[in-house]
């Protein structure tokens, strides 16, 4: 006895349907499954007609193994089973199973799905399970949807045996229920019944028709984690982003980008408790504190829009201070600064539009003048090697200490000792009309030559 090879669905759609299998019977020992199995062949005889062929062949093979071909509705396949008919097993019949000749093509449609089960109802007292139990048969033949409801009405107040299949345990059991319309609720069974295509038994055990899980009890509310929320004054569970020009992009999923949460640095500095605060050192956040040890970098420098009325070259060294061969008496404080530029004269100030380096010299070029300074002027201070300043005739703007230039630097410059004769610092003018080479006023501390 046992299972043999399986094959596809056979031709024809009739066979002997097993409605019930008794315990310890030859049918149970052979592995026959109630409701889902159809005996279509015994020996070499095809059982496609309602006659006594099955009974006769079973009697002819008492206490002898006989092969059966069985079609299963769950797997939709045919398998071979070996059974030993016997009348000594302790029950009724040679197989210990009740059979009925019918078509297995529409047998899966005759199913009544148990839905909601009310507490203390006849269905609940009988042990029917909501959404996983399927009523597949009874003592009477059920072929239409109305047959089941007619059966319930005819057994009002009387016990009724039902064959029930459970999709969770994948097994059939016999349930005895007593319909009672006066149980205190709706209906005679107190349960919902579904019939039709959407309420058929699935080919494999599934939770498709299971009742959705109930909501959490009031005493135990569900906790939903919020990634962007953390206690006030406590460090966040993620490190602070540094020098990020935009949101960091996380994993890409299909057609959208997931942006990881970010916390501004200023916000975290306000939220972190200080050494003297009450909450400092009291909370233990484990590994979260290690992520807060990342040093914060200063913000990028502020880029200011310069006023077109003057040239801001503060903080730039236009001459090599280490080379003293050009101007021995020129100190580091007398380099070209906004104050030094203002000392050149009322017409020596212009607006600049760009600055760049070319050919080993630093050049500031604008729409109105150009200043060039060589990196290495040479071993001797000569006039031809000094930077030249060319201004147009129409330049009339002048800068004053009140417009942004430092008056203190101007006074410090005038206090330096004179190392060059005043006649050598006089202005020299040359070139075509419309171009003027301006020389600074005779002041001590300035080198001789055009600027």
From Swiss-Prot:
Membrane-traversing stretches: none
Q: Does the keyword Phosphoprotein apply?
A: yes
Q: Where in the cell is it found?
A: Golgi apparatus, cis-Golgi network membrane
* Single GO biological process annotation from the record: Golgi organization
Where is the PTM Phosphothreonine found along the chain? 220, 224
Its tissue distribution reads:
Ubiquitous.
N-myristoyl glycine lipidation sites on this chain? 2
Q: Is Nucleus one of the keywords?
A: no
Limits of the PDZ GRASP-type domain: 14-104, 110-198
Which residues make up the binding site for Zn(2+)? 17, 19, 102
> Which Gene Ontology cellular component terms are annotated?
Golgi apparatus; Golgi membrane
Recorded GO molecular functions are:
metal ion binding
Question: What UniProt keywords apply to this chain's record, in alphabetical order?
Answer: Golgi apparatus, Lipoprotein, Membrane, Metal-binding, Myristate, Phosphoprotein, Protein transport, Repeat, Transport, Zinc
Q: How is it modified after translation?
A: Phosphorylated by CDC2/B1 and PLK kinases during mitosis. Phosphorylation cycle correlates with the cisternal stacking cycle. Phosphorylation of the homodimer prevents the association of dimers into higher-order oligomers, leading to cisternal unstacking. Target for caspase-3 cleavage during apoptosis. The cleavage contributes to Golgi fragmentation and occurs very early in the execution phase of apoptosis.
> Which superkingdom?
Eukaryota
Region (GRASP) residue spans: 14-214
Family indicated by similarity: Belongs to the GORASP family.
Under which name does UniProt file this protein?
Golgi reassembly-stacking protein 1
State the organism named in the record.
Answer: Rattus norvegicus
């Amino acid at each position: 006895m046992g299972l043999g090879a399986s094959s596809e669905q056979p031709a024809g759609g009739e066979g002997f349907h097993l409605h019930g299998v008794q315990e310890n019977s030859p049918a149970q020992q052979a592995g026959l499954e109630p409701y889902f199995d159809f005996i279509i062949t015994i020996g070499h005889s095809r059982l496609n007609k309602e006659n006594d062929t099955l009974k006769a062949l079973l009697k002819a093979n008492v206490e002898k193994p006989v092969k059966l071909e069985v079609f299963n509705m769950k797997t939709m396949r045919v398998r071979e089973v070996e059974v030993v008919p016997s009348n000594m097993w302790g029950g009724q019949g040679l197989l210990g199973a009740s059979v009925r000749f019918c078509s297995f093509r529409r047998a899966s449609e005759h199913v009544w799905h148990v839905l909601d089960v009310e507490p203390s109802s006849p269905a609940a007292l009988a042990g029917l399970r909501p959404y996983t139990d399927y009523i597949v048969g009874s003592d009477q033949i059920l072929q239409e949807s109305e047959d089941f409801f007619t059966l319930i009405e005819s057994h009002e107040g009387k016990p009724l045996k039902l064959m029930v299949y459970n999709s969770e345990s994948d097994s059939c059991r016999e349930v005895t229920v007593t319909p009672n319309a006066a149980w205190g609720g709706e209906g005679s069974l107190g349960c919902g019944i579904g019939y039709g295509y959407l309420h058929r038994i699935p080919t494999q055990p599934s939770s498709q028709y299971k009742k959705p899980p109930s909501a959490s009890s009031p005493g135990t509310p569900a906790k939903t984690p919020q990634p962007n929320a953390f206690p006030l004054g406590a460090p966040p569970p993620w490190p602070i982003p540094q020098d990020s020009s935009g949101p960091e992009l996380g994993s890409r999923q299909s057609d959208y980008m997931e942006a990881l949460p970010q916390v501004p640095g200023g916000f975290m500095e306000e939220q972190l408790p200080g050494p003297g605060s009450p909450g400092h050192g009291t909370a233990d956040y484990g590994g979260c504190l290690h992520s807060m040890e990342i040093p914060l970098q200063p913000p990028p420098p502020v880029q200011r829009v310069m006023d077109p009325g003057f040239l801001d070259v503060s903080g730039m060294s236009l001459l090599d201070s280490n080379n003293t061969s050009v101007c021995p008496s020129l100190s580091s404080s007398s380099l070209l600064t906004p104050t030094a530029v203002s000392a050149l004269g009322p017409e020596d100030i212009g607006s600049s539009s760009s600055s760049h380096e070319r050919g080993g010299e630093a050049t500031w070029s604008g729409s109105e003048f150009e200043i060039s300074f060589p990196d290495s002027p040479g071993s001797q201070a000569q006039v031809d090697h000094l930077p030249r300043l060319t201004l147009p005739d129409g330049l009339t703007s002048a800068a004053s200490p009140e417009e942004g230039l430092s008056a203190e630097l101007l006074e410090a410059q005038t206090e330096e000792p004179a190392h060059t004769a005043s006649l050598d610092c006089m202005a020299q003018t040359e070139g075509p009309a419309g171009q003027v080479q301006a020389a600074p006023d005779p002041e001590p501390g300035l080198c001789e030559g055009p600027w």
